Design a protein with these regions (language model features):
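Nucleotide-activated sugar donor-binding and catalytic core shared by glycosyltransferases
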Residues: 1-175
């Protein structure tokens, strides 16, 4: 699948497990319909069949590309990322992002009781402050994500994320 890198790309990283993709991708698909000026590109992984992804994509303007995550990120203007190592990778590529996660409500409730974390994204955990917006569980909806994506497409929040990404890089290179 060829990507037009002259387009402004919003990378979609829906996760690496079928369960995550099933929960995340339908909402990512709906969001993409509100941003016709942008090309949305899903970073697919080879372990998951193309047909599985396509079940959740209704917008024909979304591209599905396999095994090119770094190439996609290197050419992206922004990203919507499922929480995990991809959030740190996205930051190291300097791409402003919104971090999302939605799990089974019971699993989430149990995890919340057992694990006392202030943040779910590696970017925020490493920086010990909110650098990227985290949208989880009940907040995970088209309106909330769209409001947040608008903030990183231009303006102070976009610049702030990029500035903090440089600090993350520095933390790794100084140690």
């Amino acid at each position: 699948n060829k990507i037009n890198y002259n387009s402004k790309i919003i990378a979609l990283l829906p996760g690496s497990r079928k369960q995550e993709i099933k929960k995340m991708l339908p909402t990512f698909d709906k969001i993409s319909r509100n941003y016709s000026k942008y090309l949305f590109v899903i970073a697919g992984i080879k372990e998951i069949d193309k047909k599985f992804y396509l079940k959740f994509i209704k917008n024909k303007n979304i591209k599905l590309v396999f095994n090119q995550t770094y190439d996609i990120l290197n050419n992206s203007f922004a990203a919507i990322v499922t929480s995990g190592t991809a959030t740190l990778e996205t930051a190291l590529f300097g791409v402003p992002q919104i971090v999302c996660y939605k799990s089974n409500p019971i699993s989430y409730f149990i995890a919340k009781k057992i694990i006392k974390l202030k943040y779910i994204s590696l970017v925020n955990i490493i920086m010990n402050k909110k650098v990227v917006e985290e949208i989880i569980q009940g907040d995970f909806n088209v309106n909330k994500i769209s409001n947040e994506i608008n903030k990183i497409l231009e303006g102070k929040l976009r610049a702030n994320q990029i500035e903090n990404y440089l600090k993350i890089e520095k933390k790794f290179t100084d140690e």
